[in-house]
Amino acid sequence: MEKLRESLHEAPIIDKDGYSYLVHPLSNGVPMLEPELLREVVVGVTRAADLDVDKIVAPEAMGIHIATALSLQTDIPLVVIRKRSYGLDDEVPLHKTTGYSESEMFINDIEAGDDLLIVDDLLSTGGTMAAICEALDDIGADISDIVVVFRKQGESALDDTDYDVTSLLDISVDQDGVTIHD
């Protein structure tokens, strides 16, 4: 994870209303995402994840590129949990609350009994992931594994659940930069 570690130390930190916000290619799309970094991350996820699944699931938006590359590498189909409704017959809405917003997301193409790997870029407050897991459970799908690239230190909405999340790196962010916790 050498390139991933280097990229964190090079990433800008901006202040958003008193919140130290990491701007990183994997979690924000800027600065540009170098293929070497994406490749390293996908290899890391491949090694960390249970790949004996029916589908890879990723929330829109920043988990998509990681999950797409993983799907291409593993030949496992990809389902994107979207921010927009298309009104399709099998669409399942979910409500998510994060540390800074509330919104709806929409699930299609997941059925009871599907074994799933959830992949995302960042776990911060856990609000998005908790809402996704609850909705997938309600459908009757089996969450085999959850892997994120970065997990921010601190309380998470997943703390009081039975869901285990594997992260490639645990981090904390403040105005001075990113600290990697090994």
From Swiss-Prot:
Alphabetized PROSITE patterns for the sequence: PUR_PYR_PR_TRANSFER
Pfam families on file: Pribosyltran
Coiled coil: none
EC numbers for this chain: 2.4.2.-
Family listed: Belongs to the purine/pyrimidine phosphoribosyltransferase family. Archaeal HPRT subfamily.
InterPro entries (alphabetical): HGPRTase-like (IPR026597), PRibTrfase_dom (IPR000836), PRTase-like (IPR029057), Pur/Pyrimidine_PRTase (IPR050118)
CDD domains in the record: PRTases_typeI
A Gene Ontology biological process term: purine ribonucleoside salvage
Known function: May catalyze a purine salvage reaction, the substrate is unknown.
Name listed for the protein in its UniProt record: HGPRTase-like protein 1
Alphabetic keyword roster: Purine salvage, Transferase
Domain of life: Archaea
Disulfide cross-links: none
GO molecular function annotations of the record: transferase activity
Source species: Haloarcula marismortui (strain ATCC 43049 / DSM 3752 / JCM 8966 / VKM B-1809)
